[in-house]
Each structure stands twice: as C-alpha cells, then as structure tokens.
Amino acid sequence: MFPLSRNIDRYDTTFDHDGLIANAGLVVVATLMSRLGLERLVNTWVRTGSFAPGRKVCTLIAAMLAGATHIDHVDVLRAGATQSVLPFKVMAPSTIGTFLRTFTFGFVRQLDAVAARLLANAWAAGAGPGDDDLVIDLDSTICEVHGRAKQGAAYGYTKCLGYHPLVATRAGTGEVLFSRMRKGSAGSSRGINRFIDELAGILTRAKATGARCVRADSGFWSWELLRTLDRHRMSWSITVINNHKVKAAIAGIANDAWVDIDYTLGGFAQVAETTYVGGGPLKKHRRIVRLVVRRTRLADTAQQALFEHWRHHSFITNRTDLDTIQADQFHRQHAVVELAIRELKDSAAEHIPSGHYPANAAWFACAVIAHNLARWTVLHGKHEPVNTRTLRTRLITVPAVQANRSGRHTLRFPTRWPWQHEFNTILANVRALHGPAG
C-alpha cells in the first residue's frame, strides 16, 4: 500500500507510458461487438463507398461507450495501448468526421438495417423475449443544439432549437428497438404509422413471437395509429386528449364507480372505466373502445364550488386481460421510457455534432447501437440491472496496464477494484457467447 502523501505538489507528470490503457474495460463490450458481428454487418450493409465502413462505425461506437460526446473524443481510443483491447483498427477523428459527412438518407437507412440485424443477433444469443410478452414504449425527445448552421434543427413545441427523434424502447431492459431522427419542427406523431410498420418487421425478423403491446402518450394518439397497430396484431394502451367527447364520457361515470388506488407518496387518486365511441370521420371506421380514467384531487378543501375538484388522465386500451386497476398500473409504467431516453442523452446523444443533417442522423443511429450494446452487456453478462453511466464507471473506464507473462497477454487492473468480481463474471459470460451464424 502506498504511503499517504501530505504534499500533493511534489509530483511531476509525464505522458509516456505506452502500455497503459485508460479504458481497459472496453475489452468487455468489444468482445460483445465481435460476438454479434457488428463490423461484418456494417461492411455488408452500409455501402457509402468509403474504405472499411465497419472499422469506422466500430471506432465511433467504442468511443461512445467510453463516454465520447464529440467527434474529437474518438482520440481517447488512440492513447496508450487502448488499441490492443479492440478487435479493429482505431480510426482518427478527422476520418470519422469525413465518414459521417458522406452519409445520405439512404445510407442512414442502411445503418438502421445494421441496428435491426444486430438486435436479432443479440436476441438470438439469449437477450430476446422469445415467446414472452413484449411491451413497447413509444416516445420522442428533443435533442437540443446551439447554432443556426445545423441542417434540420428547428423550434418545436418545447420552444428549444434542436432535433426531434422518435424512439421505441423495450420495457424492462431499456433497449431501443427502433429509432428515427427527425427535424426539430416535426410533431410527435409525424411518420408514426410507417415507423410502426418497420418496427413490426424488425420484431418479426428478430423472432419475437410473443404478444406485443404498445404504450404511448397523447402526442401519438390517432385512430389511424390504432388501425395500424390492429393490422400488426399489437395490443395498445394510449393516452387520449381530453376533448369534449372524452369529457362527456367522463361526466357520465357514476360517482360510486370510482375506486381508490395506491398512488404516489402523499397523493390520492381514483380510477374508473367507461366506453368511448370514435374511429374517425368515416362511418365504417366507427368503433367502441375501452376508456380508463384516473383522477387526482386538486385540493383537499371543501370550498371548491367554482372550480373543478379533479384532474383527469384518460387512456384507451384493448387489453382484456387486465381489470381497471391493473390497466391503470400497466399504463403508468410507460414512464420507464424516460429512463432509456435519459441514458441516451446522458451519453452520445447529449451532443449532435455536425452541421449536416444526415451526418447527425448517422451519429444518433450509432448512439442507439452503443446504448443497446451497454444494455446487452448487462443482459448477456447476467449482471444486475444498472444504467449506462454506472456500467461505464464500474466496467469500462477502469485503467489497466498491458503485460506479457510467458507469452500470455495480461491486463493488470488496479488492486482492490470494488467491482472486479462483476468484471470477470461479465467478461467470462460474454466470451462464452457464440457468434452469429453465416
């Protein structure tokens, strides 16, 4: 054990250790990238015309997993002996920037195809739902930017300059099943029906054979969306806007129909159920749907004659296996989508670096792949659920020294590292995976 230093100023600093690796834990996620065939998939499907696209995408994703939020941060992989723990040649930041600027809309769609096939490989290796039910949460988020030279950046409903990507996440794991970059002025539901069509195809190819249920907030509600979900045999639980028809349906609920429920600490809420008739302007589309309403008390005082006593939150669902209270509990769990979005924006999606819109779309697609690799590292490593920042602190950004003992390469990590057992267990489990067929 080193003695306690009372004079911290006595140390000189040099940057001359060729065998030191700043982010040696990348060996874990790099092993998973290799097992899932990421570089091969990119080389096969992304045809930008540039040399070794798989090498460049892998470089960018590895840097993102190490905490990169700017293109220049890729240089962290070129420091010391970091290259030795990666199964591909690390490219320079200038090369990565040039590569991103070669992207067009079609090339971004090719990168989406890579993400879909990578998802299928990960699920085939054991991370997928198989025959179990799959709950999908839809949401959009604002990726704020600064500067007016960014193509596609605009002011949306939040009055912030940025982009407005759409994501579909898997409840329980936080994986991003599908994503689509959109310009900042896009409405929440823009392109949602085409998005669902593509998402259904991705899940089918990934062999998710169980029941599928989609949850979404009122920004996505439309009768056309319900028809799209019905066409793909997906159940749904979607918040509705309290328009005059919904308010009339709520007003028709008898007072004795409301049931008290467990709610947030210090809060009080009740739920009830009724029906809602709608479907669109065409008579052939008319339908009766199940409307579940939760109301929360605005005030505890009795002096509320001129004001409404309750705030109502309404959603429609076609789930018949849940009673009113269970349906409300299930719908409230849609909030977990915000955790996945927070992790995305706490990592590479924190910053959208380029002035070119397709380059930023490619950056966001790579950020989604990096996010999923972090999730799969936890799942395949059979580790307790942790967020990406915790995973990065415990497993990825741990330093090590490269050593050669009798011809066997060894990474020497710090003694008394608090999570060394978890590190070794996850690495062993990931190494035990078999690569994709073909």
Question: For each of these PLM feature ranges, what is it?
Answer:
Residues 149-161, 223-240:
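A short alpha/beta connector and helix-capping loop motif
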Residues 139, 210-221:
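Acidic/histidine-rich, metal-coordinating catalytic segments
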Residues 2-11, 235-345, 431-438:
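An anionic, glycine-rich sequence signature occurring as long contiguous blocks
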Residues 1-187, 192-206, 378, 400-438:
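Dynamic "connector" segments at or just before major functional cores
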